Amino acid sequence: RGEFLYENLMIQSNVIHSAYKNGVKKLMFLGSSCIYPKLAPQPLKEEYLLTGLLEPTNEPYAIAKIAGIKMCESYNRQYGQSHDVDYRSVMPTNLYGPGDNYHPENSHVIPALIRRFHEAKVSSAPEVLIWGSGMPMREFLFVDDMAAASVFVMDLEKKIYDSHGNPMESHINVGFGSDVTIAELAHEVANAIGYQGKISFDSTKPDGAPRKWMDSSKLNGLGWAPQVGLSLGLQSAYQAYLTTLSL
């Protein structure tokens, strides 16, 4: 945990400071929904930052991301007028799509499910057993939508971007706008892959947080909305996974 925190702090600090030193006027810092307190109300609003204790298992990563947000805000305050510095931060929800990590031991939920259901389909396995009750709710955003949102935020006039926050709370959430249960997600993945066997859940295994849903109303109010629904996004993600198998 110590090395992880150190490396994340150093990477972003070097990038942000080097950007300033080399005359980079605009920069975007990508955070994570884990910056918000463990017990924050749902959906997660930008104003909830630093209002409570963090989730212990994610604390080093969250602290690094919070530091990056505050570093961007502080550089804006110190160097905004003198050097035209305009460093912005966005907080994405759970992302998925082409280019994801499908490793069986350290992938996130969607690529993990894609791999498992694909292997079950190929082997004609009659059942796929998923850890947990399937009841926790999560929000997912297709990677192309995240890229589009990032460009949208970077292209905003500075006065418009600044008017939707304050100098020390300038980050913007980027989410899909609705969430699904893990059980619903599993069935969506199975449909995208064409797996027709049984899907079961092992409720003796831990579930994690019951819900994690971003409030993206600030970004929506600026005029941006996601374009790729979950079903279409999963089909695209699966085709990308098949491509990795042929490499």
Kindly label every feature range from the protein language model.
Residues 38-40, 98-101, 218:
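Short beta-loop-alpha junction of Rossmann-like oxidoreductase domains
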Residues 9-17, 70, 111, 144-151:
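Conserved active-site region of classical short-chain dehydrogenase/reductase
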Residues 14-17, 38, 56-93, 112-124:
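Active-site Tyr-X1-5-Lys
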Residues 4, 43-45, 96, 102, ...:
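Short clusters of hydrophobic/aromatic residues that line enzyme substrate/ligand-binding pockets
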Residues 119-247:
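C-terminal substrate-binding subdomain of Rossmann-fold SDR/epimerase-dehydratase oxidoreductases
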Residues 6, 10-60, 88:
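Conserved Rossmann-fold NAD(P)-dependent oxidoreductase catalytic core, especially the SDR/UDP-sugar
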Residues 2, 57-61, 93-108, 132-145, ...:
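Glycine-rich "substrate-gating" loop/helix at the edge of Rossmann-like oxidoreductase active sites
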